């Protein structure tokens, strides 16, 4: 954790969820309540088909709703895409950009991720910018070089602690059940913090740094308690309200 920084626990549903899944969002919304909600923010990013309905379910809850991606342009002939403005119009407040699955499956570059983050800023959304190394890069000892490059190229100059969250997701840990050691996570997050402070000063100190990659109730307390880890970006474990809330409530002990 980082002193004076409000943590964020975010769920990325990826390409999962139909209208029947709204019961899980409703249960999460009912479980995100003060006093913990005053100290720790919670967010679910469902598929776009559920975005507007999900925000309607959360009008009386502190639970935030966001999207999983946006186009870099505000409108136009981009079949199948969604703009940041459309997300905001559906009352979403966050958008994930640069997730490794987008970088890999859709060949998204750091330059494109940066443009998407800038589009999010223009629509007054908070961008969750994802970075992380592959297994091959890690074996070659290049993980910090990759983090440095992606932070430099993917994060816009206009980034602030209010409009930007950084999510470190080592690609080899996503959906594999394999989690880096606490020391590995601490090293990566300390490096990110130093890079952000060097570039953005106090804004860099206050930016939230999330860890993602096989986060589950059993390891949440350990991961969320690491220095400079200001929350989590959760995949599969966010699909069930009980699992997501168990991770979220790990902060009850950490903040006691």
Swiss-Prot record:
Disulfide bonds: none annotated. InterPro entries: Aldolase_TIM, TIM_sf, TrioseP_Isoase_bac/euk, Triosephosphate_isomerase, Triosephosphate_isomerase_AS. It catalyses: D-glyceraldehyde 3-phosphate = dihydroxyacetone phosphate. Substrate binds at residues 12-14, 175, 214, 235-236. One of its GO terms (molecular function) is triose-phosphate isomerase activity. Gene3D superfamilies: Aldolase class I. One of its GO terms (biological process) is gluconeogenesis. Pfam families: TIM. Signal peptide: none annotated. One of its GO terms (cellular component) is cytosol. The keyword Isomerase applies. The active site is at residues 99, 169. The keyword Lipoprotein does not apply. Pathway: Carbohydrate biosynthesis; gluconeogenesis; Carbohydrate degradation; glycolysis; D-glyceraldehyde 3-phosphate from glycerone phosphate: step 1/1. It is found in: Cytoplasm. Belongs to the triosephosphate isomerase family. Involved in the gluconeogenesis. Catalyzes stereospecifically the conversion of dihydroxyacetone phosphate (DHAP) to D-glyceraldehyde-3-phosphate (G3P). Homodimer. PANTHER family: TRIOSEPHOSPHATE ISOMERASE. This is Triosephosphate isomerase. It comes from Rhizobium etli (strain ATCC 51251 / DSM 11541 / JCM 21823 / NBRC 15573 / CFN 42).
